[in-house]
Design a protein with these regions (language model features):
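Extracellular interaction modules
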Residues: 1-5
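Glycine-rich flexible loops
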Residues: 6-7, 11-176
């Protein structure tokens, strides 16, 4: 059968159809294609773009105190050592922009040279990698750190996190 309008189907690496029916592309398609174009244009080996909506990370973008440059990176890194290891460049923040817009894509691209993962304020997270595991692990580990922070807050305390000295020791030990 042939596709109609803006419909598309999902195929695996051998071009076999893996979706049972044709599906419409996501409203985020322009952003994703712009990001792929950027990665290809820079000669980067990252071929995978993952966009998801991790509840705890999105919730944290609703707090203006976390939106300053590197504030959230520092906080999340301090919760568990794995976060710094999986996301050594940290997390960038893109102020709210209309989902699927070119403005959102451009703002995301501006963050990708400096950060491993980009959070879209009040929306979601985006990571890139050479394979699907890389961005998944980064976002998953950031989400775990956010869960630890929020669990502590829910129990009535603010988690202390690792000290600056502990974070520096981790950075040096793992060449981060």
């Amino acid at each position: 059968s042939s596709l109609v309008g803006s419909e598309m189907c999902i195929r695996d690496s051998s071009y076999a159809i893996v979706a049972e029916k044709y599906i419409s592309p996501t409203s985020e398609l322009p952003s994703h294609l712009s990001i792929h174009d950027y990665l290809l244009g820079r000669g980067r080996n990252q071929k995978v773009v993952i966009h998801t909506h991790p509840i705890e990370l999105v919730a944290m973008t609703h707090n203006a105190a976390f939106l300053g440059r590197d504030v959230l990176s520092r906080l999340l890194w301090s919760m568990i050592p794995e976060t710094r290891a999986f996301c050594p460049k940290g997390v960038g923040i893109v102020p709210y922009a209309l989902p699927g817009s070119i403005e959102l894509a451009d703002a995301t691209i501006a963050q990708l040279d400096d950060y491993d993962v980009v959070l879209w304020e009040k929306h979601g997270a985006l990571g890139v990698g050479e394979n699907v595991i890389e961005p998944f692990d980064m976002i998953d580990t950031l989400s775990k750190s956010a869960q630890i922070y929020m669990s502590g807050r829910a129990m009535g305390f603010t988690p202390a996190g690792m000290s600056d000295a502990q974070m520096q020791q981790l950075k040096e030990a793992f060449n981060l």
